[in-house]
Each structure stands twice: as structure tokens, then as C-alpha cells.
Amino acid sequence: VFETRSFRLKGYSVLVGERPGLRAGGVWSETCVFCHNTVPYFDALWGELAGPGAPTYQGTVVDRLLPRERRWRYEVGADGDGLLQSAVAAEVAAVGGTPARDGDDRRGVLAHGIRELRSRFGARNFVEIGIGCEACHGGSREHVVDPRVHPDFAPRSAFLNARAEAGGDVTRAEQVNRVCARCHQVLFSRYPYTWEGEGRRGGKPGGSSITSGEARDFLLGGCARQMSCATCHDPHTEDRRADLDRLATTAGNAVCVRCHPQYAPAPALAAHAHHDPTGAGGSCIACHMPKKNMGLGYALTRYHRIGLPDDPARVERDRPIECALCHTDKTVADLVGKMEAWWGRKYDRAALANLYGTVDARPLQATLMRGKAHEQAVAVAVLGEARRTEALPGIARQLVNPFPLVRYYAKRAVETLADRPCAVDLDRTTPEIVAAVRACVPAAFPETVPAALPAKPRTRTDDTDED
């Protein structure tokens, strides 16, 4: 906003189709307040305690969108119902809300409380604005009284218990990751699709394609019991770009070999990765946390579900194949053939042909034409950064994508390929956008003009669930 002196679309919350006539109307207390400030953990649990069908709100714990083996269960003790309802009533009164009706059961009290919080919680209710110590460390009165008592990450309550639904002990790393996931859990807003899943409303929602969902995505992977977000990120200061970049090199493998020491020797890593162990392909993160999520600056960030690039759920459901993020010149057949030879997989060629049109297609270029919106954004960004000038016409078509966010990725890619900025207003009509881009980069639209954007204003029911 400040650099361009113009309004821009925020990366994670607006992956929705074109909606002409939409008026700005975000309410801070409803959409921002719970993640960008220090709010009692208890307030984030009301939706989970009320159960399915409860009113939704930003900042609520969303364990139901995790696989069962990753969920926590929040339970009220046998004698705790009255204490719970009294605590909810006290929170509602603190924000100036009205009490629940006499005789309401626990669910009714919680649902009423959620509506009151959504409409009334504001700046006047905070001890401090922004993220303070207790946003992560919970109530820390004992630590203030006696600094020798260290704050804890585990939730504590006289009437409420938290436990792993699958049983077993909860590790400290899991507790830390849960703290991060209170805010970094945005899934896909109204956008229904996910990575390697059935979508938001399916039985197995996968990983997010947007920024701010990193902690939830991390919980989906296999490392979240032993490794915490704080292993790579300093929660007390902004990460230095150089430090994050180093993690994506072979030097960053030192983090991974703490638990996977068998890959520390270079020959073992080469046999595992089938790449030069000293080069970019020898980085653990490069393959297991690929850059394919949409960030706020119209550049890609890393997908935080630590997994396998050869996983059939990724290869046969998602576009583009992750190996194509580096190997932009290879075809689908080239890439899956290598994965089958290297790791003993067997992929469904018919499913791949359905995704890409043909297995002889290059995954990124085919994704431009056939992909879902989040997949198209990835293809656009990668082809632009790779300077694939032959893909320019396909990238330029995304400048009139029905999803405005994808257009911004396309504009950045076109400008990267052209090596200069283009004065293009992406909120204009299709003919105006095409004319402006042709004036800047004639090769972008050599012949055909893309179809016009949707003319009918979209309504709220055109999208999926609330944010």
C-alpha cells in the first residue's frame, strides 16, 4: 500500500472470484482482533466447546479441520459446567455484552458469547494492543510475582482439560506449535480447495495454499511432535531474511539430521535425494517444504506441511508436480518416470492425463490453462522467476483471471520477464488491461484476446464458508 500508493488485495483473505460492486466493510473486531492482539486463550476455545454448527469467528481453534491423530480434545470436568458458564458470562460482561438467557444450556451460552465477542470486542478491551508476552505464554501472573517460575505453554484451567484425542503424552514441541496455530491457522477463507486434500468441506481437508496457515500445515506433517515452529523461527523478533534463506540450503540440513542422522553423510544424502548433495537439490527443505504457497508480496512462500514430493496424493491430485518447480523444462512423463525409477512409486497415467491434458505436457504450462486458481498462481510465479519467456502469452492470460489475486501474481511475472514495470490497473475491464499490457510488452498478447471477466456481480452465496 505505502510503496505503490494504492490499495492492494491482501494475500490470504481474498482468494475469491471477481465480485463487482463489493463494498469495503471489514470490521476490525470481527476479522483481525483475535490474531493480531493478546487475547485470552479461553476465548479462542468457545467454538470448539460449543461443537459443530456454532457461530464462527477469526482466531477460533479449529481442531475439527485436522486429522483425528493430530487433534486435541477440550473437555469440561464433571463439576465444571457451572464454572465454564460463569467464566463465559464474565468475559461477555467485560466487553459490555448482554448476558445469555436464563436456562440456556452450555451450547447456548457459548453461542451467545461468540456473537457478543464478534460484535463488541475492541481496542478498549485490551491491556495492550498487539502481540504481548501472554499471547503465547498464557496467564503468567506467577512468573511476574516470582521470575524463577517460568511461564508454561500448556493450557491450565480449574474446569477445562486439553488432551491429545489419539491419546499419549503431549510433547513440549506440540504445545509450542499449538500456541503458534492459534493465529497461523488460516485455511483458505472462502476458497474451497486445498493441497492434497478433499477441500475445506471434505472429510480430509489438506494444507492451505495461502500465507498465515503455516502452523496448521506444520501440524499435518510428520515432524510436529519433535520439532517446533521455534526451531526455525524466533518468536521474539522478526526473522532475518538471510537466516531463512540459509535454512533452504544444504547448511540448513543440520536441523533435519538431528532426527534423521542417517542422511548426514554426503553419500547417503545423494542416494536418498538423487541430486548433488552439495547443490540446491541436496537441500532437505527444497524438496520437503517447496515454495508453493501465496505470500502477501505476490511471491511464493514455503508450504509448511513437511511431506514427500513423490507422495501420490500430491502427484496425482495437485498441479503442478513439485519437481517442476525447479525442473521447469521437463514434461509430466519425464518427472513421474524419474520418481518411479528413484523411489519405486507407480503413478496413474490416466489421472495425470486428466490433470494436464497429456503426460507429454510441461506441468507448469499446462497448469496455466487447466489449473485451479491457487495452482495457476504457483505456475505464474515460478515461470516468471525462471525467466521462461516462451510462457509469456500464457502468463499474460492470467492478467484477466476471474480471481483478482492471481492477476497480481501474473503482473509481477510479466514485469519480471519484461524487465520493467507496466502501468496496468488490474481492476479495469479486460480490453483495457490487454491494451495496457500490449503497450508495455507487445509479445504478451500477440494474437488472441482472453475472454471477458464475469459481468454479473457475485453474491455472498457464490463463495463457500465465512472467513
Where are these regions (language model features)?
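Primarily the internal scaffold of c-type cytochrome electron-transfer domains
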Residues: 1-16, 41-382, 386, 405, ...
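Compact, glycine/acidic-enriched structural inserts
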Residues: 26-27
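Conserved catalytic alpha/beta cores of large enzymes that bind or transform nucleotide phosphates
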Residues: 30-43
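Amphipathic alpha-helical scaffolding segments comprising HEAT/armadillo-like alpha-solenoid repeats
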Residues: 358-367, 388-400, 419-428
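Conserved hydrophobic register position within alpha-solenoid helical repeats
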Residues: 379, 410-411
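Alpha-helical scaffold repeats of the Armadillo/HEAT/TPR superfamily
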Residues: 394, 423-447
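Hydrophobic residues within the alpha-helices of tandem HEAT/HEAT-like
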Residues: 413-419
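Eukaryotic intrinsically disordered, low-complexity regulatory tails and linkers enriched
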Residues: 447-467
